[in-house]
Amino acid sequence: NILDMELGVNVFDMSDPTRPVRTARLVTPAMLSPHESLVVSQEGGVLAAVLGNPAFGPGIVDIYDVSEDCRNPVLKSSTPLGLFGHESGISPDGKTFFSGSPSTSTLVALDISNPSLPRPLWAGQYSSHGLSISPDGNRAYVASIGDPAGMLILDISEIQARKANPQVREVSRLTWDTVTIPQNAIPFTRNGKQYVMEVDEYSGGNGGPIPVGIHGPNVGAARIIDISDETKPKVISNLRLDVHNIANREEIASDPGAQNPTGGYAGHYCNIPTRVNPTIVACSMILSGLRIFDIRDPANPVEVAYFNAPVKPRVLTLPAPASNWAMSSPAFVPERKEIWYT
């Protein structure tokens, strides 16, 4: 937004998706550069973010009330309690906000049940990128850039219960052969069975993540993880495109945009429309656009649709090219059968 001279977080009324109407622009500290941390709890009526950037920011957390009118968020607090900022998570009830910074290996939990007076609950040394919280608030599913990179399942029940001096316990950790930079991990159930949908961003070399601007041979992409036994999670399927397969990487290396510093042929975010019996996963696959997978059989996902938006010139085109690539976490309007992304 700064590069396009649209400073801050812009709020739009999307009642008519063909004619979006901007209703507010949020320019408090965290909203000037929330990086990947912007989260909403519909149940709690809360919008929150932590000041961040591609490395890490100083951890200022902004909390807005959106319970009355989400088109006009009301600032409740702006405090330097996030320690360091890059990514985040929020409990479904909107009472706990997590500030994650993989570069500094810090994860902070804040009590935001009173959004005007947030308070620290816990801080730990985890290289957390994005994280999602279970419906009961007792588990955190962490996309970890630690050693090894992969997914962590953390027992955060003492934070949820607001115990004094809460302790967080590691339930399990998992990695995979194609791991690059784990981006986010989202739990869901399908026919009563528990899974996690996890996505890695960008590409890497055989020795792990490499600079984003390099067309690496190894693409993390996305996967479905069976967590029926949360102490022994296992990858049961992958959400990948042909351009992600190592055998094809050299052939496509000279394609326009393949060496794009913002990611080229790789993944960035995936999301599901519901955590209970979702039928699809939508993924922002950067240069490959929006890709839709049928996951009714989680062990055998099938790509069923894709969309590459028309090129729209930017005010500034360096380092990023004209914007027809997909980066954001897809959002859903199921009643209108819509998917939104940028």
Each model region followed by its residue ranges:
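Feature marking well-ordered beta-strand scaffolds used for ligand recognition
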Residues: 1-342
